[in-house]
Amino acid sequence: LRKTLLELGFKCIEEIYIKERSKFYPVMVLIKGEDELSKVELTYGKVALINNDEVLKEYLLKKKDELEKVFNKIASSRVKGDLELIDRGLDYYGIK
């Protein structure tokens, strides 16, 4: 969304996040203009980040927790699979 708005010649001058029914939404005030945004600013909103928006912080912490759980499950299953493969290899040596 922010990338498209920039391409259309708009820049955000005010931004807050709101939470409704466990969903997060950015609310922006735009004016005609140009701005340069880093990848993180483009993703989450430069103004909201600079202003330390509390709802955005809650969103980021929630997403981090969700992704870490997914990552740990993937990593665990990958490690488990690797260990099983190693055990099968050690079976050739009579090692349990």
Predicted regions and their residues:
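Class I S-adenosyl-L-methionine
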Residues: L1-K96
